[in-house]
């Protein structure tokens, strides 16, 4: 954050030290300013291009997405990150964000949501091609490939008739999946030398490092 802006915020905090609502508003403003700065920041990466996944090398047209979530405390402050590549290997985007109080599973789902939303924004109406979304979360991959079809048959209920955890996020992800008729979710082992997964992990943790949650 700009030094003058930080000094101004600190002065306001001091002047309104006895006003609880003002302190909350200033804290929210500070977080939003830091989050915007993160959006504008380019986080360095190695100069070597990311290797193209085998799944899309043999396709006429395909895209690869990578998604990862992080959480400190679980529940606690969390973050998500996603990146996308086209068939030439070009990195189309990197996006990331933070939430104050969340869980690791929620951030894993959110990473997939945000990656698909960004790809949809870039592609516009050209969605009928193969999309491979790679995640190190079996929770996300099995949820999308196995659990959700069964939940929907039961009116979004599990076999024990209980409502699935994180239902709103699952429903949002399922809704977005509808725009991608040839979307596949693929599990990759985390922290095992997968370059794009490691990059998303780096982005997510960088976002958490830069935002001070109270």
Residue ranges of model-derived segments:
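Short, low-complexity, charged amphipathic interaction modules
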Residues: 1-41
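Charged phosphate-binding loop/patch that engages nucleotide di/tri-phosphates or the phosphate backbone
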Residues: 12, 196, 200-214
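Residue-level signal for secondary-structure boundary elements
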Residues: 20, 38-41, 75, 185, ...
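Intrinsically disordered, low-complexity linkers and terminal tails enriched in Pro/Gly
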Residues: 35-59
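Phosphate-ester processing/binding pockets and catalytic centers
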Residues: 38, 92-94, 100, 124, ...
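RNase H-like nuclease fold core
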Residues: 50-106, 114-120, 206-214
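RNase H catalytic domain
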Residues: 70-74, 113-199, 208
């Amino acid at each position: 954050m700009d030094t003058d802006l930080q000094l101004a915020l600190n002065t306001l905090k001091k002047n309104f030290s006895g006003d609880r609502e003002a302190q909350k508003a200033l804290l929210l403003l500070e977080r939003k300013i830091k989050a915007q700065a993160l959006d504008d920041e380019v986080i360095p990466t190695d100069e070597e291009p990311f290797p193209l996944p085998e799944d899309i090398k043999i396709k006429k047209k395909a895209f690869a997405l990578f998604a990862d979530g992080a959480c400190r405390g679980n529940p606690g402050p969390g973050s998500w990150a996603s990146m996308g590549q086209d068939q030439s290997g070009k990195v189309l985007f990197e996006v990331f964000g933070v939430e104050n109080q969340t869980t690791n599973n929620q951030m894993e789902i959110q990473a997939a949501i945000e990656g698909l939303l960004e790809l949809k924004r870039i592609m516009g109406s050209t969605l009928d091609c193969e999309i491979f979304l790679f995640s190190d979360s079996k929770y996300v991959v099995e949820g999308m490939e196995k659990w959700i079809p069964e939940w929907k048959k039961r009116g979004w209920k599990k076999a024990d008739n209980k409502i699935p955890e994180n239902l709103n996020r699952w429903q949002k992800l399922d809704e977005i999946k509808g725009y991608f008729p040839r979307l596949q979710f693929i599990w990759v082992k985390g922290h095992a030398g997968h370059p794009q997964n490691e990059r998303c992990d780096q982005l997510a943790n960088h976002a958490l490092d830069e935002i001070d949650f109270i």
